[in-house]
From Swiss-Prot:
Function: Component of the Mediator complex, a coactivator involved in the regulated transcription of nearly all RNA polymerase II-dependent genes. Mediator functions as a bridge to convey information from gene-specific regulatory proteins to the basal RNA polymerase II transcription machinery. Mediator is recruited to promoters by direct interactions with regulatory proteins and serves as a scaffold for the assembly of a functional preinitiation complex with RNA polymerase II and the general transcription factors.
Assembly and binders: Component of the Mediator complex.
Entries under PANTHER family matching the protein: MEDIATOR OF RNA POLYMERASE II TRANSCRIPTION SUBUNIT 25
Keyword Nucleus: yes
UniProt organism field: Danio rerio (Zebrafish)
Compositionally biased residues, Polar residues: 286-306, 679-689
Protein name, as recorded: Mediator of RNA polymerase II transcription subunit 25
Amino acid sequence: MDPTSKSGLNQVSDVVFVIEGTANLGPYFESLRNNYILPTIEYFNGGPPAETDFGGDYGGTQYGLVVFNTVDCAPESYVQCHAPTSSAFEFVSWIDSIQFMGGGAESCSLIAEGLSVALQLFDDFKKMREQIGQTHKVCVLLCNSPPYLLPAVESVSYTGCTADSLVQIIRDRGIHFSVIAPRKLPALRSLFERASSVAGLPESSHPDYSQDPFHMVLVRGIALPVAPGGGSVPVSLKPVLPPQSLPVNQNPLVPVASTAPQMNTFQNVSLHAAHDAAQKALEEAANQQQKNRFGQISTPPFSQSPVLPPGGKPSLSTVTTVSPPVLTQQQVPPQQPQQQTQVPQPGLPAVNQQPPQASQQQPNNQQTPPPTQPGMAAVPAPPPGAQQGVANKVVAWSGVLEWQEKPKASSMDSNTKLTRSLPCQVQVSQGENLNTDQWPQKLIMQLIPQQLLTTLGPLFRNSRMVQFLFTNKDMESLKGLFRIMTSGFAGCVHFPHSAPCEVRVLMLLYSSRKRIFMGLIPNDQSGFVNGIRQVITNHKQVQQQRSMQPGQVQPNQNFLNRPPGPIPVTHGNVPQQLRAAATGNQQAPVTGAPPNQVQGQAQAPGGGMLRLQNPGANPQLRSLLLSQQPQGGMQGMQGMHPIQQMVHAAPGGGAQMQPQWRQPHQGPLMVPTGPRGPVTQNPGMPSVSSVMEDEILMDLI
């Protein structure tokens, strides 16, 4: 088997999925998606995709999607191709949007067309990666049909090539070719074998990744969860990760002393008992955590099969889901390499979910740094942000991060703010040059709702990333920071103008994918500052427009504070007016139009003018409404729409006014009633108008 590259966290990869978009694959796609596609994406992404993750266009994993059909799709194109993206979340949305149609009358599919376009994507990747050099390239074919014996015709560079010749080109270019199918097709297996290098291992040595006995899963360059009952032998076939981290990736329920020789020895027939014990533990873990594969961002799907191949993800995806009793067992033997198991304990997920265990284990983690991994020497102790085991990081800056948040105690004044601070470090990868000599000792952070930053995506991509690590000396502040950063806020760190440093602004985000606090330093500092100012200015203008729209009621607090009297009756405000009328004991007799005319006038605009909770069902309510108007109703109509003035005219003129507004405005009457935002606000959309957020936005401007 071709040696796999190091797993996705520290590797630059180019991944292209070639998927058959016909109805032949549609019934099986959900199973393939959950068992193979999502684990593959998480393998390269470092964890479950999250919408708030920001990745660089040139330094992270690039994903491409090619969807091919059959010859019966004419006159449509044979292939649909999506432009490369660095967002795993966006890539998953592309895959979920595939519509499997056609192909029911065909026994083959246009695999050659799909592979030819995939090769063109890899050519584009090569141009994008000129500054990086060699990357880990993977092409995954998902289909349920054998290929036509026809050459590709739609590709520009590979016209005339058949599927067999295309997989040979894929092999010659060092691209790892994988095949996933819901059934075992000899033609697809032949394609996979043609893409094998001469020095590859025999087919019997490939791990059995299939989660269903009917599935055919032949992969290279990817580490998937090993199928229950078939993963004991292939575990030792891909020793790619460093030996000191391999025991952590094995089943945590088995002593590491028995799994370490298993990883260092390719074929050791004397460890069948250890394999059996590992297999039983694997099945138990899979049964317990199968349902949590992709439902929660904080629970990576690899937790269902802790016995990963050595080419699998490092400890981020596996160890962070280990239960506290298992961690306690792993900490007993002192000779075991524990730097990986210590990482999730002081990390913020442990702070959020298991505070007792985290508080008990953190002192031990800080006082006994593992001497077994040389890469950890650069970090004095794993603070609670070093969830990944920062093996190749160096400290670029040390200081204090300060921010303000609203206190949780309801007894305190709502305008009072609680100032928190945490000692922190900024770390960069080895070889990177970040000049922090002029950075202040204290960084002041202001919180911004992430929904305001969605338009600044290009500026985020054109930025360099650093890692923030925090100590666990103040657990309350650490919990507060984690709670805020995971509830839709981002931190904007402003550097004072008095500091003569190149960086003027830095964004602090919590990456649920990598489980770290990462700082993004935009390369275009002035453009980023202007972008934030523009976003905040636009937000304030929208807020002002909402509060100043004519004919609409101000927020409920202002409305309740108004004295009773003649006020405009608009959307949904009848109960307040009724309350005001009742307190004033205004019981004027009803004269003029009959009640049925009033009811017709109120209902004719389609609920836009006068929206009663139950129109026509409360005659007392109608009489109170009508009794309000003669006492100076013209004063209340001055700020109303002309059509509203007609509707809310004195009751005596109701009969005359009714034909005037019904005939010319019966059709478009619902349009000029104005926006109904303040009344029909969706409670699910978080409003960015709280006291804390408004003050933050004012400070940023």
